[in-house]
Regions:
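Alpha/beta-hydrolase superfamily serine-hydrolase fold, recognizing
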Residues: 11, 58-211
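A glycine/proline-hinged amphipathic helix-loop "lid/cap" segment
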Residues: 1-73
Length: 211
């Protein structure tokens, strides 16, 4: 029979072993842990950054996709902006973008919808664009807005999503939004444009398009 000291030591090292086992993950899972940490950090932005006074949010479902509706006292219920968030199609969420979009709603007078579209690596492209199309069409078919009332756009990957969603709608002969905008769009994911190399070699690195 083990002594009290031995039992205590066994219990202590058993806990340590459990912690070590939890930390050691398969190489294929390491990237996923990194992505989850990035998502957590992104969402913290929504809790830290200041929001516009009087802003409010409502969670609903559009085309089966969790979506936030963001308004301020300046928001016109007849002027709709569908915002696709950035994040390299891997991170980003309504939670993380909420502060920024409250200010955008205040300054533009739009009522903003931001979908929590599917992300990689759990969902391969073009799942993201499919969600972009679904949310736009749901604004029309489920909430009764006319295409002329709706503009959509986004930043980075959201800018790419805006352009591709527009092309998908056009190719299918679907209704189009009244306007589309892109903020620093990730328009060349494969980095095939000459400007990437030319800018990086001939100018200050921080002025190149990669930044």
């Amino acid at each position: 029979m083990l002594s009290k000291e031995a039992m205590k030591a066994k219990k202590k090292y058993s806990k340590l072993g459990s912690i070590i086992s939890w930390l050691v993950v398969h190489p294929k899972k390491i990237k996923m842990w990194k992505v989850k940490l990035q998502r957590l950090n992104f969402n913290l932005i929504g809790k830290i950054n200041p929001k516009s006074d009087g802003a409010s949010k409502e969670e609903l479902t559009l085309g089966g996709i969790r979506t936030w509706k963001i308004t301020t006292p300046n928001s016109d219920p007849e002027k709709i902006l569908l915002y696709y968030h950035g994040g390299a199609y891997q991170v980003g969420s309504p939670e993380g973008y909420y502060p920024m979009l409250t200010h955008l709603a205040r300054e533009t007078g739009f009522t903003i919808y931001i979908p929590d579209y599917r992300l990689a690596p759990e969902h391969y492209y073009p799942a993201q664009v499919e969600d972009g199309v679904k949310t736009f069409e749901a604004l029309i078919n489920e909430l009764g807005y006319s295409p002329g009332q709706i503009a959509f756009g986004g930043d980075s990957a959201g800018g790419n999503m805006s352009l591709v969603t527009l092309l998908k709608l056009k190719d299918k002969g679907k209704s189009l939004p009244s306007a589309v905008f892109c903020i620093s769009p990730w328009a060349d994911p494969a980095a095939t444009g000459e400007s990437y190399n030319d800018e990086m070699c001939s100018k200050d690195l921080l002025l190149g398009p990669i930044f």
